[in-house]
Amino acid sequence: RVEIHVASLNYGETARLMRPRYQLEQAQHLARVLRAVDDNVHVVYVSPFELPEDVVDYYRRLLSLGEAGSGDPAETPRQSRIGRGARNPFGETSDDVLPGGAFTVVVPELSDRFPSSAPLAQVCLCSPACVKRLRYLAHSGKASPVLIPGVSSGWAEKQLALLLNTPLLGPDPDVSSLYSTRSGAKRVLHAADINIPSGAHDIYDEEDLIIALAKLIAGRLDVQRWRFATDSDNGKSGRAFLHVENLEVV
């Protein structure tokens, strides 16, 4: 199996612009290359920027620990377990078609021309050499390819999967955007008739918030503190608390 990991974080534009380390956060999924510990899996990891060689070597050596040998981590790993195409992601030599138990790092050739707030999947779509390279790695052998997105799939991941003629592991973007929020999760739990804590969801303006909060406080006088959370508080920043004892009247 060939796993193409495009760990794009599909936050809204405002949320992305407010995250100065957004590009680095997209690269935090690098540990996915360790899925290549399975000899039947070859991992193609798409990185938003060029990775330092010592970082790539670190993961290569982690994978090499499962090899037969002296067990010394300093021992050079066997070539069959590493991605020799990592330093030259667009070269199409026979060495780039790697067996299972290995990984290849691919960097979109136009990544440095996009702002740091650009989602990785969109950068891939605008990088023709990267798309060509991913298609080559996905279909050069008999292994079954699959595209694995980041936190959730969006229109860019869907379009990329169509270009690569590769299945997308994840829900349809329309379904994902509908149920990946807190309100969406609440709707699913209510439909399944599962007991959940008291609360309100699908609140879209101040008037709805005040009415829902007044009903909750009046109906649960034993609750002394209520927590507010936005539907998608990326980075846990969209949270607040209300202490009922500070209210004079409800």
Task: Show where each model-derived region lies.
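ATP-binding N-terminal substructure of ATP-dependent carboxylate-amine bond-forming enzymes
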Residues: 1-180, 184
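Active-site nucleotide/adenylate-binding loops and adjacent lid/helix of ATP-dependent enzymes
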Residues: 172-250
